Regions:
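Phosphate-facing sequence motifs and polybasic nucleic-acid/acidic-lipid-binding regions
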Residues: 1-308
Length: 309
């Protein structure tokens, strides 16, 4: 294909994959983003006029992981040049065994420190409650500083309405003296769109509002400024762990246990810089920029492109 490469080079044409695949037509996405920005601005204005302060934001979102995350992404491995086969040193079934990471982001960057970071929850796929009780006891024994970490199980490894309500109950502080109203964001995921979730948020002092369908990849801070870096760090740590275990075993297939994956995720998430970057995302996505337009310059990436249209 040398002639083809020379032809492409002469006309300055490159063969590339799209770096973003939207889930809805661009016109629909534009409309949903506009609705999101208008409604959040109106909610902020309402709270400011009635209570005299600008409400802060929180956002939860789940992201899928696997028992062997690097293998699930089909990352390359080392082999000798000219070798006809590539050795398999991982449990292939573990690359398909899914679990969910449910993260929480906070718009107040100044409050994030070594002693105060947004918590998270891991949901593994398991029937019954025996595995859940075992993993919860494991987490309770650990001395986790600066954040709340919980673990649950479910038949599908994905969140249902009841799971979301339980997560909110464990991770959102109750309403009381000194609390202020906050805006709580969810993506357009059916179990989170129920009246029960709305009522629970209201009782805890949160105005719950959802991103438009297909718009979370543009304006949800968990997607734009947290999960990508979390996944990269997790894969690095998990790969190093599997290599150490492979050397220790001297051969055979290696697989990270649920407990080891919990430990790795705690190591990743116990970095205030990771959460502060996610906090900056509220400005980058236009969620809580100044209402007078003085911070519009901070809106960037896809959100900035749509904001300027």
């Amino acid at each position: 294909h040398r002639w083809l490469n020379q032809l492409l080079a002469s006309y300055r044409i490159s063969h590339r994959k799209p770096n973003r695949k939207f889930k809805v037509p661009r016109a629909v996405l534009m409309q949903r983003l506009e609705i999101f920005w208008i409604v959040t601005a109106k909610l902020r204005t309402m709270v400011m006029l009635h209570f005299g302060y600008d409400p802060t934001f929180k956002n939860i979102d789940q992201s899928p992981f696997h028992q062997n995350e690097a293998g699930s992404k089909e990352w390359g491995t080392l082999a000798l040049v000219g070798q006809h086969t590539v050795p398999l040193i991982e449990n292939h079934a573990a690359t398909r065994e899914r679990w969910s990471l449910n993260t929480l982001t906070d718009s107040v960057e100044e409050q994030i420190s070594d002693d105060n970071m947004p918590g998270f929850e891991i949901m593994f796929k398991a029937e019954g409650k025996q595995v859940e009780a075992k993993l919860q006891a494991y987490v309770l024994k650990k001395k986790i500083l600066g954040m709340r970490v919980t673990v649950v199980t479910g038949p599908s490894g994905s969140y249902r309405e009841n799971d979301i309500l339980n997560f909110l109950e464990k991770h959102l502080p109750p309403w009381g003296p000194g609390r202020r109203w906050e805006i709580f964001l969810l993506d357009a995921y059916a179990p989170g769109l129920t009246d029960n979730v709305q009522r629970f948020g209201w009782l805890r002092g949160y105005l719950i509002f959802t991103h438009g369908g297909g718009a979370s990849m543009v304006c949800q801070t968990n997607d734009t400024d947290l999960h990508q870096w979390t996944r990269k760090r997790f894969i690095d740590k998990q790969t190093a762990l599997l290599l150490r275990e492979a050397r220790t075993m001297g051969g055979g297939l290696v697989e990270a246990t649920r407990e080891e994956n919990i430990d790795l995720m705690i190591e990743v998430m116990q970095d205030p810089a990771l959460h502060k970057q996610a906090s900056k995302g509220y400005k980058y996505t236009g969620t809580n920029v100044a209402l007078d337009g003085s911070e519009d310059w901070r809106i960037c990436r896809e959100a900035g492109d749509f904001w300027q249209e």
